[in-house]
């Protein structure tokens, strides 16, 4: 019994550290190769098969630039395609895109339709001035939403 005590703690302590050190790697490493792998087939087949109209139609922004050998890279069309790709990446993550000023106003004031749906969540005077709201302390409904 005396041998099992320190052995169990010695087993658990390295295990915990090993788990914490290894956890970020599966989350961080596969994302970058996956993204690169997704982006590569869009551009490279267009450069190989630029003569086919179907390929040109599928990859709109990139194929003409690849077909010209990068001559149109300084063209406005190329810069537009680059800007569009940046906008797409930020659009998938709206928390980074929105400025903090807008987020503050949005969280404070819901649109009127949502105020009607959630009178308990926001402190709008129109919703709280109803005769049946807020419910009495002894009511069995508690903090549920009012039936509309």
From Swiss-Prot:
Polar residues composition bias: residue spans: 88-97
Biased composition (Basic residues): 22-42
Ranges where the record places region Disordered: 1-108
Record-given protein name: Uncharacterized protein CSNK1G2-AS1
């Amino acid at each position: 019994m005396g041998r099992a005590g320190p052995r169990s703690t010695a087993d658990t302590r390295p295990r915990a550290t090993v788990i914490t050190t290894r956890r970020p790697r599966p989350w961080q490493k596969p994302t970058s190769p996956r993204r690169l792998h997704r982006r590569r087939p869009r551009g490279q087949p267009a450069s190989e098969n630029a003569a086919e109209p179907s390929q040109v139609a599928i990859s709109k922004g990139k194929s003409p630039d690849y077909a010209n050998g990068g001559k149109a890279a300084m063209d406005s069309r190329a810069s537009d395609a680059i800007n569009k790709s940046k906008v797409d990446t930020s659009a998938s993550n709206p928390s980074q895109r929105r400025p903090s000023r807008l987020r503050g106003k949005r969280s404070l004031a819901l649109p009127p339709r949502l105020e009607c749906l959630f009178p308990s969540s926001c402190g709008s005077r129109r919703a709280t001035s109803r005769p049946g709201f807020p419910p009495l302390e002894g009511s069995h409904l508690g903090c549920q939403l009012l039936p509309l």
